[in-house]
Amino acid sequence: MAFPQTSFFTCVQKLQAALQRWAGQTVPLNCGDSFRLHGIDQSNTVVGLDDLFFVVQDDHFRPKDEVGMQLLNQELINTGTLRNSFFPQILMTHGENLDLSLKFLFQGRFQVTVYQSRADHDPVALIEKILGSDEMAAVNVPIGAISALPRGVRLFWVARALSDACVLFDATWQAQAPVATEGRMVVVIRTFGGAAEVQRLLASFNNQSQTGDYGQMLKNTFFIVYDALAAKNTPPYIPSGQDYPLNVFVLSGPNMGGAGNLSLELLALQKAAAGAGIAVNELVVADDDVSLSLESLARHWATTLFRTDQAFYTCPIFLKSEPRMMWEDGGLWGRYTQENPSGQRRAVAPRLLRHAKIFHGSDHLGDMARLHHPEYSAFIFLSLPFDRLAQLGLPCAMFLRGDDIEYSLRNIAAGGVTVSNPNLAAWHEPAHSYAQEYMSIAHGVIINMAYGQRKPDDLATFFHRRAAAHLSLSDVAGLTVYAEALADLVACDRLLQPNFAPHYLSVIARFKSFDAAFSVMADELVASLTASSAREGKVTVTAPFLYMDAYSGTDPLDHVVLTNSHTDRRCIYDPFEPDRLAALSSVAARLYASLSVFIQNFDTLRAHYRQKIAASADPAFWLAEAEGKSFEVLHGE
């Protein structure tokens, strides 16, 4: 297809030139070259989280990142933790067989012990060595073929100083390249209003690059940032006048949501890489507000160098606000949920795997060592072979919510799998709003129809139950979300359509008025309101703003307090205010009318949206979306 002569094409040409310059300085791996699989992660900046990085005990030294790790006699470093244990199962299953070794760069005298550990078993010492040198020295400790390790094993090492003034400069799990590879990885990040978050992430990578041997990985990694509608006063992504090790290209364009911005970014990358005639091996999609260490990114690069299949790779996601809590490690869509415990795809909800696990010390590490295959991965962190992109197509036009689930299920339908890498970890914060719920439901129903749900009964029951809950509390806002999602689904002219973004932007603007009804309110005020209602023989109901239970109490309602836990804001209203009841009746009538159409035309709707997913995944769809729009290169020309 001929590329339109637009400003988008101009950006692609500039990206092509940047990729050619990058390819000229990447460092390929030749057969037999040693490479770094897994180093020490010292990126913790959260007070009180040390035990996720190193075992904390009386004789344990907490390492600094200045001039190595300086230890006194009998002080030790124990890496048997979440962030510094080595979990080899993903390599054993999805990669070439590698000969493993542990390389120490040190000065002084150390006792080094390598342990293996499995779930429900005490750690077993594999190797113990005494290392000694008055000068800085490097020693390789051979471990053996990775295929010879037990399934579900976790490896870690303990180094104890046997004299004063010992220094451990570095320690890395290493392997030798079984074949040659270019080893090129592209990381794509898209943002709308989150430029500062992306800049902080890149700055953290720059700072951490000084603390480890990341040179080859950074030379072989190219970052592309799509900053939608970038503000004119946005600070530069890369500080001027500094020796900067990251290869970064930033472009700006229209805001088409997370999915649309990503598809435009990937389309530009595909066209530019093809025009430059260069091979890209791995593609990483990362969120703009993710917190990820450079060590995690380096481990990921090494893990994918000699992959033997086209699996999607993801990683455990922890909460920024509760950094010991894992929020998800991938998930299943519409199956094995509380509402639908079966394996059939019947629910419009995810089953988050390893959800809400709390990590202290070695808790859950045996479970983490096992191979973990979720059904889908969020675009918080997802990686795939670059060639897989051409086979699967681009993310479809879902603006926000569900685009990553659909893409993962598309991969499975094409014979792929998703696997989580426990050697990595990312921190992120979930959010939810009325507009996001609209998109979650509308897109969730489309996903179910496209990937397995062949009858409308369970979906109809879902809408009936949600309507009953919101009607019982006279909640106009929540009921409107489901009414509008259903109406737009059955209309067939609003979702996954050409020029799709304006519809979503209008939805977001419309639902912001509902969000604006929420405000910060002290607990004691809610308690006073509750007590006042009780004195009058009535009840004030406090409920989440979405997914509340239907009110079934016998006491008459006095007030309703809806809470959005993501924003810590509340909305209080009188459920029997006349205008509210009139609006509630009108919205309910629209919802049930749309639901009737949905049930009667389910097969037609299912065929329609399956076709629309395929159409909006085609590069031609996104070329048309880009036509006539304004784009600009902000950095990397």
Label each PLM-derived region with a short phrase:
Residues A276-S291:
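Short beta-strand-to-loop acidic/aromatic patch adjacent to the donor-nucleotide binding site
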Residues D170-A177, S420-A435:
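Active-site donor/metal-binding and catalytic loop motifs
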Residues R346-F381:
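A recurrent flexible, glycine/aromatic-enriched loop bordering the glycosyltransferase active site
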Residues G253-G275:
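Glycine-rich, basic loop-to-helix element that forms the pyrophosphate-binding segment
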Residues F205-L251:
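Acidic donor-binding segment of Leloir-type glycosyltransferases
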Residues S377-F381, A390-L409, G415-N421:
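Donor nucleotide-sugar recognition loop
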Residues E295-A347:
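Conserved donor NDP-sugar-binding/catalytic core segment of glycosyltransferases
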Residues A2-P150, F156-A161, A442-E637:
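Terminal low-complexity segments of carbohydrate-biosynthetic enzymes
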